[in-house]
Structures are given as structure tokens and as C-alpha cells.
Curated annotation (Swiss-Prot):
Binding site for NADP(+): 353, 357, 393, 405-406, 445, 449-453, 460
Annotated knockout phenotype: Abolishes the production of ergosterol. Leads to pleiotropic defects such as hypersensitivity to divalent cations and a number of drugs such as cycloheximide, miconazole, 4-nitroquinoline, fluconazole, and sodium dodecyl sulfate. Also leads to sensitivity to the Golgi-destabilizing drug brefeldin A.
Keywords for this protein: Endoplasmic reticulum, Lipid biosynthesis, Lipid metabolism, Membrane, NADP, Oxidoreductase, Steroid biosynthesis, Steroid metabolism, Sterol biosynthesis, Sterol metabolism, Transmembrane, Transmembrane helix
Superkingdom of the organism of origin: Eukaryota
Pathway membership: Steroid metabolism; ergosterol biosynthesis; ergosterol from zymosterol: step 5/5
EC number(s) on file: 1.3.1.71
Composition skew (Basic and acidic residues), residue ranges: 1-18
GN (gene name): ERG4
Pfam families, alphabetized: ERG4_ERG24 (PF01222)
Similarity field: Belongs to the ERG4/ERG24 family.
Coiled-coil blocks: none
Positions in the Lumenal compartment: 1-39, 124-138, 198-232, 347-414
Residue intervals on the Cytoplasmic side: 65-101, 158-174, 250-326, 440-473
Record-given protein name: Delta(24(24(1)))-sterol reductase ERG4
């Protein structure tokens, strides 16, 4: 450990970072009994989510499309059993996929895979992996090209009437079922493949339900295609983006204009999809890629959960006449201003953190993708050198709050919901759910960093004392 604070404040490039990973967390194929720490309520919580996730998705969709965005409840004098049968009948009539729905769903997957293998991109390396004796896996990143080639192709198909994009909303229940089935099927196949064929499993508890949920493999691949990275960017956020783009095209076709409310949601979803695409190589060195296993939780949520629950602001604006959400000009302008300000902090904070990681690893390559915003890269950033050889950034936006990118991220989600007003609870699902997720992740990260850095983390917190909101939280 450095003797005093002045020795911990270093200028970039003064020291060489060790390429050997630090084993501060359990490693190996099987966890020892004293290493097992169940998250999400253990087996009971996992069973609840395996059943609850799809049921919640169906219920939210039914309320959005068939109950005018209201919470569906039994009518006066209607029994709960009759009510549940009615909901089930709606799923049978409107949520069972036909061949056309599977064609739409799988064609998108196929083209995303083809584009991954064929479009230009850049190569980068992940973190040193303990189970591979410090080896860094190569990652090919071309999501930026993929996003805009896919957008061009989709618009050509739409305007030539070969495929009207808003069909994915008109057949929402059926296509969502395709995603739910695929999420379960892919998770089961990958888990069994890992256990019995590849044997590339890690940190298993021996509780198959829990291990299935959390995942068995760490970095499953099809050649150069890393499944975890592929699922994290292209399937969820591109799908959400195209759902909203379809809604905009429908409004333009129906009314001759796109409402300011749907416009701000479209801007938000494009900004987010674009941010994930342009920063794909910056996802590579994150905790999720280096240590999070790839199981049902990540697979299902990326295939089905994210695109088909986070889109309820879009569904509300699509299913309702614009007269039902006619806000004042000041309110509408405020939504755009708050969104763009939040995005600026979200983009630049993440860029500062990830550029610092690249600098410390000796990677001096730069990539200026649109939009390249001021203050994305810190020159000669201040940082701490910990006793285990790691570097902690104590400069830029992170001196204001350690999770300032979470705050900015959540603020964007708040704008999504505010665009719809308060007549339906379902557009508010994402910001409420996301707030819980971010708080859980923040405290999980706090505990992880405390274990990893020890007293160095206490020193770091003196430099960056706030978590979410400067001088408040």
C-alpha cells in the first residue's frame, strides 16, 4: 500500500499495471460450502422469478392493449377464476405465435449474426481471466455498423411495403411469446451443453435451479462471436429501438406527424441503442463480461425482458390517441432538455471511466464515434494506486458521485415515463424497476470493492464520498 495520499495520486503512465488478475472472489468450477452466497432469495426467489417474469410480461401487455393501459382487475361480480380464464383466453387468441411471427423474430436474429461476422469493426481484449491463467480473450466489436445497416435495411423494407415495421407492435403478444420461449429454450440448451459437453462451467453451487438461473458458463462463444456481449447489446436495445421506430412510422402514416411525446421516447431509445453500439468495446473490460456468468437471468432478460417490458411507454403512446396525452409546450420542451442533459452526463461519465481503463491497460487507441461529446476523455487523470496493483479513478465526474452514471441513466428512464403522464402505471414500470436494480447493483459493487481493496476503498471514498447525488446521497 502507498505510504501516504500523495504517493497514491499518480499521473497516467507512471506505473505499469500487472496483467495478472487479482483473485479476491471465489474461483474454480465448484464453490466450497463456505463460499456459497445466494442472491435473489436463493431457490425460492429463483423459482418465483422463473414463473413470475413471463406472467408479469403477459399481464402488462394485456393491460396495455386490451384494458386501455389500466390495471386489469375482475369486474363487479366477476370471480377471480373467471377473470383469470379471460386473461388466459386473451393470450390464446392474441399471444400464440404463428409461422409469420417466428419468421419475423428469427430473421432479426439471423441478420444480427450475419452482420456480426461480415461487417467491419474493431478488435479489443477483455480483462485477464483467472481460470485462463491471466489470458485476455479477444472481442470483435461492430455493433455501430450493425445498428445503422440494420436501420437502413428496415427502412427500405418499410417504405417498399415489403415489411411494415409497426407490424411488430400489431403482433406484439405473439412476437413476445417467441422471445419468452426462446429465452427459456436457449437458457436450457446452453446450461445442459455446458454441463455435459463443453464442461466450461464456473463457480457452481450444486443447486441446479439456482445455477441454471445464475448461469454455468462464463464466456460461451461461437467462433469470434461472444454470446454474452452479443446478447447484451444487439438483441435487447436494438429490438427496443425498432419497436419505437415502428410506432413513429405508424403515427406519421396515421396523423402526418410524430407527437412530441413519442418523439422524445424515440430520441431516448436511439440515444441508448447508439450509446451501447458505439461503446461496445468499452463493455468488454466490465465486471459483467469478466465475472458474471451467462445464465437464465441474463439470457431471458436480454431476449425478452428488456425489449418487451421497457417498451411500455411506446405501447401507451401507440395505443392511445394523441389527444389523451396532449401536454403543454413547456412540459414537452422540458422533457427534451432533461433527457439531453442526463444523456450528456451518462455518456461522458461512462466514457471517462472506460477511457481511463484503456489508458491504464496501455491501450492508446482512440475511437471518436457519433456523438463524440466534450469532456469524454480526461487528460492526465488523477487516480489511486491500491495495494493489490489496481487503479481507482479520482477525477472527472466521479469526484461528484461514484455512481453518477447510474443517476444519469435513471434520469433518462424517468423521462420515458413522464412523456406518457400519469394515466397508466405501466410506462412507469421501467424507472421503478430500474431504480431497484441500480440501488441493488450499487450496494453489491460497494461490498465487492470493499472486499477487493480493503482500506484502500475507504481512502477512495474520502476522495469520492457521494454515491448517486452530489452532497445529497
Amino acid at each position: 500500500m502507498a505510504k501516504d495520499n500523495s504517493e497514491k495520486l499518480q499521473v497516467q503512465g507512471e506505473e505499469k499495471k500487472s496483467k495478472q488478475p487479482v483473485n479476491f472472489l471465489p474461483q474454480g468450477k465448484w464453490l466450497k460450502p463456505n463460499e456459497i452466497e445466494y442472491e435473489f432469495g436463493g431457490t425460492t426467489g429463483v423459482i418465483g422469478m422463473l414463473i413470475g417474469f413471463p406472467l408479469l410480461m403477459y399481464y402488462m401487455w394485456i393491460c396495455a392493449e386490451f384494458y386501455h393501459g389500466k390495471v386489469a382487475l375482475p369486474k363487479a361480480g366477476e370471480s377471480w377464476m373467471h377473470f383469470i380464464k379471460h386473461l388466459y383466453q386473451l393470450v390464446l387468441e392474441n399471444g400464440i405465435p404463428e409461422k409469420y411471427d417466428w419468421t419475423i423474430f428469427l430473421t432479426f436474429w439471423v441478420f444480427q449474426i450475419i452482420f456480426y461476422y461480415t461487417l467491419p469493426g474493431i478488435w479489443t481484449k477483455g480483462q485477464p481471466l483467472s481460470h485462463l491463467k491471466g489470458k485476455q480473450l479477444p472481442y470483435f466489436c461492430n455493433a455501430m455498423w450493425t445498428l445503422y445497416v440494420t436501420t437502413t435495411l428496415v427502412l427500405v423494407l418499410h417504405f417498399t411495403n415489403l415489411f411494415r415495421l409497426y407490424v411488430i407492435i400489431d403482433r406484439f403478444g405473439r412476437i413476445m411469446t417467441c422471445a419468452i420461449i426462446s429465452g427459456f429454450a436457449f437458457s436450457i440448451i446452453l446450461y445442459l451443453w455446458t454441463l455435459f459437453i463443453s464442461h466450461d462451467y464456473h463457480r457452481m453451487t450444486g443447486n441446479h435451479l439456482y445455477d441454471f438461473f445464475m448461469g454455468a458458463p462464463l464466456n460461451p462463444r461461437w467462433g469470434i462471436l461472444d454470446l454474452k456481449m452479443f446478447f447484451e447489446v444487439r438483441l435487447p436495445w436494438f429490438t427496443l429501438y425498432f419497436i419505437t421506430l415502428g410506432a413513429c412510422l405508424k403515427q406519421w402514416e396515421t396523423y402526418g406527424y410524430v407527437t412530441p411525446q413519442l418523439g422524445v421516447v424515440m430520441l431516448a431509445h436511439w440515444l441508448y441503442a447508439n450509446a451501447c453500439a458505439k461503446g461496445e468495446e468499452l463493455i468488454v473490460p466490465t465486471w459483467d463480461m469478466a465475472y458474471e456468468k451467462f445464465g437464465f437471468m441474463l439470457i431471458f432478460w436480454n431476449i425478452a425482458g428488456v425489449p418487451y417490458t421497457y417498451c411500455h411507454c411506446t405501447l401507451y403512446l401507440y395505443y392511445h390517441d394523441p389527444s389523451e396525452y396532449h401536454w403543454s409546450t413547456l412540459y414537452n420542451v422540458s422533457l427534451y432538455v432533461v433527457l439531453l442533459c442526463a444523456y450528456y452526463f451518462f455518456d461522458t461519465a461512462n466514457a471517462q471511466k472506460n477511457a481511463f481503463r484503456k489508458q491504464m491497460s496501455g491501450d492508446k487507441t482512440g475511437r471518436k464515434t457519433f456523438p463524440f461529446l466534450p469532456y469524454q476523455i480526461l487528460k492526465n487523470p488523477k487516480y489511486m494506486v491500491t495495494s493489490n496493483g489496481s487503479y481507482l479513478l479520482i477525477d472527472g465526474w466521479y469526484t461528484l458521485a461514484r455512481k453518477i452514471h447510474y443517476t444519469a441513466d435513471w434520469t433518462q428512464s424517468l423521462v420515458w415515463a413522464l412523456s406518457c403522464g400519469f394515466n397508466s402505471v405501466f410506462p412507469w414500470f421501467f424507472p421503478v424497476f430500474f431504480l431497484v436494480v441500480l440501488i441493488h447493483r450499487a450496494f453489491r459493487d460497494q461490498a465487492k470493492c470493499k472486499r477487493k481493496y480493503g482500506k484502500d476503498w475507504d481512502e477512495y471514498c474520502k476522495h469520492c464520498p457521494y454515491v448517486f447525488i452530489p452532497y445529497v446521497f
